[in-house]
Amino acid sequence: MKYIVMQDVFFVVLLLVLAVPLGIYMYKVMIGEKVFLSRVLEPVERFGYRLMGVSEVGMSAKRYAVSVLAFSAVGFVFVMAVLMLQGFLPLNPEGMKGLSFSLAFNTAASFVSNTNWQAYSGETALSYFSQSIGLTVQNFVSAATGIAVLFAVIRGFIWKKQKTVGNFWQDLFRVTLYILLPLSLVLALLLVSQGVVQSFADYSVVETLENGAKQLIPLGPAASQIAIKQLGTNGGGFFGANSAFPFENPSSFTNLIEMLAILLIPVALVVMFGRAVKDSKQGRAIMTAMMIVFVIGVVAITISEQFAGPHYQGVATSGSMEGKEVRFGVGGSSLFAASTTAASNGAVNAMHDSLTPLGGLVPMFFMQLGEVIFGGVGSGLYGMIGFIILTVFIAGLLVGRTPEYLGKKIEPYDMKMVCLLILVPPLLTLFGTAVAVMMPSVQASVSASGAHGFSEVLYAFTSMGNNNGSAFAGFAADTTFTNMVGAVMMLLARFIPLVAALYLAQNMAGKSSVAASSGTLSTKNGMFIGLLIGVVVLVGALSFLPALALGPIADFFTTFK
């Protein structure tokens, strides 16, 4: 246990050390200031703008949102076409056939929405072309879209009397060129150096040591996709077993760098936020709130998995190792599970369906908090800003003062947008789960009975409704109902809050700042951090406690039998 504690502390410290300079760098990218890569990348940037016909004219929230939706729609159609027609496309050495309409629809929605829910196994269903040209490209642009929208939201708080929130095409291009591509290149090369596969060769047939039997070894351009899958909080694995597969995550060292990659940009964006609003204490307050909840979750999962459960009381064990890789152990698996669900990533290095009931409850609850404990790149922070405004609003009601945040007064219109930001994911999750448990096809998809069977369904629709993408793998996801309903859920959960965030940003940008007074609520002290955590957890608890009581909580009490 001491080793696990040391590992977790080292991880958090290293994460913060890496995130601070990256956050400062991203702030410079956001405001268009020169960075150390400018000499190399500025000519590429100018050429890209000329090629796409991009002007630097600012956009209103409506125009920005239309640009995001149109761009995403084109990506959706392209990915769906590639998946359905892959049998006729190049780079298909294994002769993979096109996906069914419902599966292609679900997969396209999943990757466009930055969810990366996978109802297929990559090595048996997709060609190299589909993986690299279809899905990997979406991993880049969906992540860049989230960060671009966050840039717009931040401008809403730092600009005064403005009618625009920035230019989507410029933001998208700069995020991709200056942030995601360089980081992904470095990480991909690092992964390849550690043995992660990067090849366009045919699958290999090898003779095993057991009776000379033949075995097919899948290959492919995995490292390049894994790099952006982690950095962009996408999470979709090149192989079916995701980061539990040795070709994706071969050692404890690659496990460390993949976990760092999952949280690096979300944490750095908080640093960037503090820099952008000219008050680092604001960023530190948000970081502290996120980190407190994250650490509590890591501790809860680790203890639950290390001590396995009441039925192992008095038995000497090394923890619950079912569904875990020996090379990672309980500590590496628990930290990964917390990281991937706190950050809206969804990659896994262990089977979450095999976690103990309380161990599985924590990742599920992280998602149900709205993916704001770090959350997805961009979307996590603008979701947390929604919770901050809600917290300020509640505090203002308590003391009878007009609430304000960063010098901008909070008005009824702002609260309407915040409600859309906060309430859409839980409503989609609960409605989807309620409908799903009544469907015979979903009931047949569940591998377990009783409380754990319900947990499998709840986890699946929580994951899709909050753009995470991980799953309790005992749930057979490739059914027409789950594919179609899940796709609609993922798109709505992504784009309704995104559009609401943009309109919130424009309304804030149009206001002038008001000077802080003695009655202004401080949003950077310990009291506010506690209030913020309370509001985030309370909204999650009130929304999901009844469902959790029927699932993982009831499942936990069955272990006393």
Swiss-Prot record:
- Could you list this entry's UniProt keywords, alphabetically sorted: Cell membrane, Ion transport, Membrane, Potassium, Potassium transport, Transmembrane, Transmembrane helix, Transport
Membrane topology value: Multi-pass membrane protein
Which first-to-last residue range defines the signal peptide?
A: none
Highest taxon in the source lineage: Bacteria
TM region(s), chain numbering: 4-24, 65-85, 133-153, 177-197, 253-273, 285-305, 380-400, 417-437, 484-504, 528-548
Q: Provide the protein's localization.
A: Cell membrane
Q: Which family does it belong to?
A: Belongs to the KdpA family.
The protein's name is Potassium-transporting ATPase potassium-binding subunit
